[in-house]
Amino acid sequence: MGLEKSLVFFPLLVLLALGWVQPCLGRESSAHKFRRQHMDSEGLSSSSSSPTYCNQMMQRRKLTRGHCKPVNTFVHEPLADVQAVCFQENVTCKNGQTNCYRSGSSMHVTDCRTTGSSKYPNCAYRTTQKVKRIVVACEGDPSVPVHYDGSVEDST
């Protein structure tokens, strides 16, 4: 009799446990979100110079869900080089936090900005390639980029 009760309650316990665990499994980490939104290491090819690069990448990376994200930047450098920025010059973030870092050297980036005629769901972007020093917010142990805070022109 006790075994029968256990067999009835065990599936219920499993379902209850999955209900708690599943939302955690589906949540994207800040570091993964940064990579999805801003990293395109292979993009330093002819494809990133295409006028439709931003239109394609913004959709592919799911940055146009529910609205047109007005501005986004893709970095065309190896992930290790971008992660290394977290150990370079510490600067104050735009929001006043102190966990931002500026790259010591310039990096290839593509800026995507909505055009004047862009209206959801038909998001349209202007593609501009640049070479700039980037600023990222970093968190964790080891410290990794979790937010793209901007870029700065070289002072040389």
Swiss-Prot record:
Gene Ontology MF term list: lyase activity; nucleic acid binding; ribonuclease A activity
Keywords: Disulfide bond, Endonuclease, Glycoprotein, Hydrolase, Lyase, Nuclease, Secreted, Signal
Enzyme Commission no: 4.6.1.18
GO terms under cellular component: extracellular region
Disulfide bonds: 54-112, 68-123, 86-138, 93-100
Domain of life: Eukaryota
Tissue: Pancreas.
InterPro entries: RNaseA (IPR001427), RNaseA-like_dom_sf (IPR036816), RNaseA_AS (IPR023411), RNaseA_domain (IPR023412)
Function: Endonuclease that catalyzes the cleavage of RNA on the 3' side of pyrimidine nucleotides. Acts on single-stranded and double-stranded RNA.
Family, similarity comment: Belongs to the pancreatic ribonuclease family.
Protein name: Ribonuclease pancreatic
Organism of provenance: Glis glis
